[in-house]
Amino acid sequence: MLRDKNKVLSDKIMVLGVDGLDPRLTRKYIDEGKMPNFKKLAEMGAQRHDLVMLGSQPTVTPPQWTTLACGANPCVHGITQFSRTIPGKIDQCGYNVDSRILTAEPMWNGFTEAGYKTLVMHWPGGAWPPTNDSENLFVIDGSAPGSVGSAAMQCDTEQLIGASVDIPEATFIVRDLVNAVAPCVITKLPDQELEASDTAKGMQMMTGLDSEKTSQLQDMGIETINVIYKDEQGFGTRVGDFQQNMSTAISPIKEAHGWASAPADAKEFTLLLCKGLIRRVGLILKNEQGIYDTVAVYKSKKDTTPLVTCPVGKMQYNVIDEVIDNDKTYIANRHYKLMSIKPDGSELKLHLSAAMDTQCDTVLHPKRLAKALMENVGPFPPQSQMYTQDIDMQQSMIEVWDYVMDWYTKTF
């Protein structure tokens, strides 16, 4: 690409990729007017009318994106899957979304060598770590799919907190989906099972099933409520009619007492975070009409200023707090949303997004990008991977991803 010899339409170009986008459905929805933004992008750029591209095998994220970057098949560029075998260690797999495995040249190296400033942002195939030391190259992550920083910066999982006057004590339940497609549910462990009646009461507000219906289903051998089993090897859980990729905590709701500053009619509950290693406290507050519709979360009852105040139905973004992961403390940001609350304050559901380390710069090149992004755009945004049919949870997930897209836009 020589500027003095080739006539070009623009000195700036953007290559935009969307993982898993079906070209047939996209073309159909563009033509039907259902994807106006994609239509604008198509009108501004270049692509086949049917949007079909020549892919490669296997049809999974890392090799496909690397093929797009290098113009070579996986058998040539070397990134063939999410993981790879390690010579001499047949019982171990290595992470494969790693540019150091590349045996082909990605396009951005060619751009930088031709004198063009190039930003590679969240390209999950051959982008990280940088394979070019040019001062024209800027890289923001690319170490994993999901969203920017999802592998390197996430220091706590998403969490659903349920509180009710019917719950006897605060309990933390580690997430049931980690790297599996289906949850690991451990059943029939002797003498270490919660009482089914307590579980039914405590989780009724999450499942939408009353205790009688829940008991009937349990008698049929169908696990539809949260049942916790704990042994020396860990936890297995299931919550409601959806399987979750997040942790869960439940808490009793009581009359507020012992606070430095709390209204006389306030109620309180406990937030167990980070596998129960961090405890926060919440006040349930009335509005002017005497209806409970707001939650305020504090570090402790001694504090007079809350970490966050959550009116029902409104996402609160970038709440900064401590997070503990693997015995290390991080200063992290996450979002809070009070999804529902009963008018009498007897029951509530609170969603917390994953937490992101605000001081991590390990997947940015050059590292000064971390400070520039933090000051001009904001903390790296959490992502959401809730696979659920619950409408409230779906809406919360959409709001989390909308914020991710806003962050991307501001970054550009």
Regions found by a protein language model. Give the residues of each.
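A short acidic-Thr-Gly-centered motif at the start of a beta-strand
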Residues: 1-9
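Generic signal for short, ordered secondary-structure residues
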Residues: 5, 17-21, 47, 89-90, ...
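Beta-strand elements within well-structured catalytic alpha/beta cores of enzymes
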Residues: 8-27, 41, 68, 111, ...
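Short, mixed-charge, low-aromatic patches
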Residues: 22-24, 62-67, 355-362
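Extracytoplasmic/secreted proteins, especially bacterial periplasmic and envelope-associated proteins
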Residues: 25, 33-37, 63, 106, ...
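A short acidic (Asp/Glu
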Residues: 25-29, 130-133
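Short, structured active-site-proximal loop/turn typified by the sulfatase FGly-forming signature C/S-X-P-X-R
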Residues: 26-75, 117-119
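His/Asp/Glu-rich, glycine-adjacent segments
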Residues: 73-411
